Every structure is written in structure tokens, then in C-alpha cells.
């Protein structure tokens, strides 16, 4: 609890004028789901009271809806490709003033120092960054990360560095089976939250996962999964990101049964969509369009995530809360016409106010993180196999981070070569295989964003030039110090440099978004790619904790059985 502020109390009593009076609006009261015609009196950063009173500044919103600001229930900053200050500049105009962030991408590259560097950079910004302690670094033993965290590191992040809980427990087999190390990481949360990650986990397995102390899940893809979780008291974060778009499949249960134990999250969001469509307000718009009443949408987008994550200063506009206020001339647009953060106007008309967000210097340890040793050649990335050979292939599912374990004949339509190159210690370790679902006809796509260990992942066409283009793409990433590239005919067609841990840019959000658009356009044009977000999909084919089949620097992994499998059948 924050210490009482005598100035706020004086304004609340009416003894002193408010610093700001927002009048003429309808204030949303989450507890009663009412719209109350009243004014908000703000003292400094805090809502001091409701009702008309003297104030140094008055803003008449002309009948607008006044709501708490949006909170993202679960996200990874690194997936936006933006450094922390640019992310805040991007989302404030859309009404988001708080996130629950799991920086396990940074942790996989740089360990605890990467996490604490992010915390320090975010602290001065006009934003609430709730940072969780990554629990599974590396995500599994099947891949080579740049760092490893055990229960002592997790505990230190919570107890010494202010992490607000333990982040998603991706090693759900370990938790369910009672692995002592995983249970020790869970226990490190103490009285704070322990987030989950349980794709496809149901029945007794889910019972065990919950009995261990896990409290939430954002991996539901089917309504039946979400219903079972809520029935058993588990929070469900309904995800609508760039690759995983699960809201349409899950929101009907909220329409039918109400919003209890549910909240909205983005998980992984690309910068182009972030600037174009919005952030949590985009999720809110989709939920409302699916039939969720506006009042319940606000619970999902504002109040519930704030309550779950312990953001007690956010989530409603009662006296004593932080004055993170959104004004909607038309609530149905879900685009706020004004955004106040801690009592200060930070955006109006969808545009950030000048000087609203200070620069956050980039720590030097985030640069120079791509270490390949000798750059692998075409033969190392794409071993020759005879046409007609039966092989396993990672089957990409558009708009999902799940994959299929495909068994195909080499040479079939819509196949691509695939490889993952270790990039943290220059070991030269390369895992090779095949992928389907990209529609790749020519060239190669490569990325140092490769969940969760973030090695170099590359796919190349099955034609004679594919291996050469794969080698060119990997070499270019080494030159850039990280990023994403499209190569065709031995030349770079487009690229997005990501020099910060190989995950994020140091450039303005609009520039990064434009580069991402150009990269996707090159992939769809010159290379023939048919899926909507090819680089987001590419980044997930190495994720060795979500079924079914994945490729890592150690080869193919069958996640259903948690074991390595050979390429050839």
C-alpha cells in the first residue's frame, strides 16, 4: 500500500482545489458495471474524488465515456521488435498504460542481467511495467540458449529485483510430474503470482498443474479448454496476437457465462499490426464485435488483468487509484480520444503528446550478441537427400504457434528446407530438417528471433538455389548483429536489423513497422510465400515446448513425447 498523500486527502475533502477536473463524462464503475454521470477530481497522479469541485484546470469531455486504461494480461516486449521507450510511444495512444511482461526472450540471450537491464530502462517511463521472472530458460533441454536460469535466479528476480511473480511455466510435463527443480521455481513466487503455459493439458494433468500452484494460462485454443480451466478456478488470458489468434474460438464462452477469471492479452504482437490496428483496444474491439457487452469488455481489458497481477493502483477510477483515464467520445470505436497516465495527458486524437515519453538509453550488453563462429555453408544448412525419401516435416499452421508433425515425401509441393544454427557461443551446431506451410517457392527467410532460445532459424526453397540463399541469409544476419532477412537469387531482397539481443530494433516504431511491411512484401512477392505473417511463423518453428514437431539446433523434437526424432522415416 502506498503511503497516504495529505494533498490528495485535502482535495478529496474539498479543502484544496484539484489539479485537474475531468467533467461532463460518464465514469465506468467496474464493481457495479454502471456508468455514473460525474466528474473526476485529480490531485497529482491520483484520483482524489468524484463530483464537481474547484480545480486549477478543467476539461469538459462532452458526455464521453471515461474508463480505466487498458492492461495487457500477458506479453513479451521483445516480440514487438521495439525497445521499451518506442513500445510505450506506440501503445499509449491506443489506451494501454500497463502490461504484465515476461522477458524470457531477453533472458534466453542474456540471462538475469538482460532482465534487470530491461527493468531499469522501463522504470522512469510513464507506464506500469509489471515484469515477471522467467521460469524456463532455456525452454527445454533440446535447444542451446545463451543463458540458463535455475530456481535461485528466479527467486533472486522476485525477492531482490522486484519481479511481480514467476512467468509462464512452459515445462508443464516437469511441473505435472513433480520435478523438484520446477517445483522450486514455482515456490520462488512466494505470495506472488505463478503464470501458466499448458497447451492441450486437460483432465488429471490439468488438475496436477493447478495443484502445483499455477494460476493462469494463455495457451487455450479451444473453448472446451478455456471452460475447464475457469470451472477449476484457473484464470484464462484470451490471446489475440500476430501469430496466435484465439479470441474468436474462446470468446463465446465469455458471452455465454460472463467474464469471471478471464482477461485479454496479446502475447506476441508485430509492430506493423500494433501501429495499424492497436493493442489491447484491438482485442477489445473484437470481443465487443463478438457480442460481449461493453461493460464486460472493460472488465476483460482493464479491471481483471489489473487485479490478477496486483496492479492495485489500476483497474478502476475510484478515489485513491492512479489517474490512468481513457476518454471515448464513441466507446464502440475502442479508440480513445484522450489518454491520461498518472493524471497527465499523454495522447489525444490517437497522437502522442510531444515529450510525453522520455528516451530510455539502451544498455551496451544488448549489442553484439550474434556469435556464429564459422558461418555455415550451404551443405551444412541443407544436406542432400534423394527425391522420394520419406521425411518428417514441421507443419506450419497459419495464425497459430502450434505445428503439425507431418510425414511427407521429399519433393512434394509446399516443402522447404529448414535449419537452426546455434548463435550464442559459436559452437557451429546446426540442426536441419524440413517445413511445410510457408508456400516458399524461391529464396530463403532467416531470423535471429527464434523462440525461445533465439538461435538463427532459416528456411529455404527446395530448388537447387535454396541452400545457397540460406547460407547468404545466415551470413547477413551475422553482419547485422541480428535481425530478419529475405534472400533471393543470392541477394538480400529486404531486411529488418535487430541489433538489440538479436530481438529488438533501436529505431523508431514507425520505421521498424515500415521495414517489417517491406520484408513481408518481399517474402510474398519475390519468394512466393503465401502465409500472412511469415516471419512470426518462422520464429516459432523452433519452439520446443508447444506441440507437435519442432526444429532446434539439436535437430527435430517431437514435443508430444518430449524426445528427439530423426528426419528420415
Task: Name these PLM-found stretches.
Residues 72-83, 138-151, 215:
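Active-site mouth loops of central-metabolism enzymes
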Residues 2-11, 88-193, 257, 492-495:
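Divalent-metal coordination cores built from histidine and acidic residues
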Amino acid at each position: 500500500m502506498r503511503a497516504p498523500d495529505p494533498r490528495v486527502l485535502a482535495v478529496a475533502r474539498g479543502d484544496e482545489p484539484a489539479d485537474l477536473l475531468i467533467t461532463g463524462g460518464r465514469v465506468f464503475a467496474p464493481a457495479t458495471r454502471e456508468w455514473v454521470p460525474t466528474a473526476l477530481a485529480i490531485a497529482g497522479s491520483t484520483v482524489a474524488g468524484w463530483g464537481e469541485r474547484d480545480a486549477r484546470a478543467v476539461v469538459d469531455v462532452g458526455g464521453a465515456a471515461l474508463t480505466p486504461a487498458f492492461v495487457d494480461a500477458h506479453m513479451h516486449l521483445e516480440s514487438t521488435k521495439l525497445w521499451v521507450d518506442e513500445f510505450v510511444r506506440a501503445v499509449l495512444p491506443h489506451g494501454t498504460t500497463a502490461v504484465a511482461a515476461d522477458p524470457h526472450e531477453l533472458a534466453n540471450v542474456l540471462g538475469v542481467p538482460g532482465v534487470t537491464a530491461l527493468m531499469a530502462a522501463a522504470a522512469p517511463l510513464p507506464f506500469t511495467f509489471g515484469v515477471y521472472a522467467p521460469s524456463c530458460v532455456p525452454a527445454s533441454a533440446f535447444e542451446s540458449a545463451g543463458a540458463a536460469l535455475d530456481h535461485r535466479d528466479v527467486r533472486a528476480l522476485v525477492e531482490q529485483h522486484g519481479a511481480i511473480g514467476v512467468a509462464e511455466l512452459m515445462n508443464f510435463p516437469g511441473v505435472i510430474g513433480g520435478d523438484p527443480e520446477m517445483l522450486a521455481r514455482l515456490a520462488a513466487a512466494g505470495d506472488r503470482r505463478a503464470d501458466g503455459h499448458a497447451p492441450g493439458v486437460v483432465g488429471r494433468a490439468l488438475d496436477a498443474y493447478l495443484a502445483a500452484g499455477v494460476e493462469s494460462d494463455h495457451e487455450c485454443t479451444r473453448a472446451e479448454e478455456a471452460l475447464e480451466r475457469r470451472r477449476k478456478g484457473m484464470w484464462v488470458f484470451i490471446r489475440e496476437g500476430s501469430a496466435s489468434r484465439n479470441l474468436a474460438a474462446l470468446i463465446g464462452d465469455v458471452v455465454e457465462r460472463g467474464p469471471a477469471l478471464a482477461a485479454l492479452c496479446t502475447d506476441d504482437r508485430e509492430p506493423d499490426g500494433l501501429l495499424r490496428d492497436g493493442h489491447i483496444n484491438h482485442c477489445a474491439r473484437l470481443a465487443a464485435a463478438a457480442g460481449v457487452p461493453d461493460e464486460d469488455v472493460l472488465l476483460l481489458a482493464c479491471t481483471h488483468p489489473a487485479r490478477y497481477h496486483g496492479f492495485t493502483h489500476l483497474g478502476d477510477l475510484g478515489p485513491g487509484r492512479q489517474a490512468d483515464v481513457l476518454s471515448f467520445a464513441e466507446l464502440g470505436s475502442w479508440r480513445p480520444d484522450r489518454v491520461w497516465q498518472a493524471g497527465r495527458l499523454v495522447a489525444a486524437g490517437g497522437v502522442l503528446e510531444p515529450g510525453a515519453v522520455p528516451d530510455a538509453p539502451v544498455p551496451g550488453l544488448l549489442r553484439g550478441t550474434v556469435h556464429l563462429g564459422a558461418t555455415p555453408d550451404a551443405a551444412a544448412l541443407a544436406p542432400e537427400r534423394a527425391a522420394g525419401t520419406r521425411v518428417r516435416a514441421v507443419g506450419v499452421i497459419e495464425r497459430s504457434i502450434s505445428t503439425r508433425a507431418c510425414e511427407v515425401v521429399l519433393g512434394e509441393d509446399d516443402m522447404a528446407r529448414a535449419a537452426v544454427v546455434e548463435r550464442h557461443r559459436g559452437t557451429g551446431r546446426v540442426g536441419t530438417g524440413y517445413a511445410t506451410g510457408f508456400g516458399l517457392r524461391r529464396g530463403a527467410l532467416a531470423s535471429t528471433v527464434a523462440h525461445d532460445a533465439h538461435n538463427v532459424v532459416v528456411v529455404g526453397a527446395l530448388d537447387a538455389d535454396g541452400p545457397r540463399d540460406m547460407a547468404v541469409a545466415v551470413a547477413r544476419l551475422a553482419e547485422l548483429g541480428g535481425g530478419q532477412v529475405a534472400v533471393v537469387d543470392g541477394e538480400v531482397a529486404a531486411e529488418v536489423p535487430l541489433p538489440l539481443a538479436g530481438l529488438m530494433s533501436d529505431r523508431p516504431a514507425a520505421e521498424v513497422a515500415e521495414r517489417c511491411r517491406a520484408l513481408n512484401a518481399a517474402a510474398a512477392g519475390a519468394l512466393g510465400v503465401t502465409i500472412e505473417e511469415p516471419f512470426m511463423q518462422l520464429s516459432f518453428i523452433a519452439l520446443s515446448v508447444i506441440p507437435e514437431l519442432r526444429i532446434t539446433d539439436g535437430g527435430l523434437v517431437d514435443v508430444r513425447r518430449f524426445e528427439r526424432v530423426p528426419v528420415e522415416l
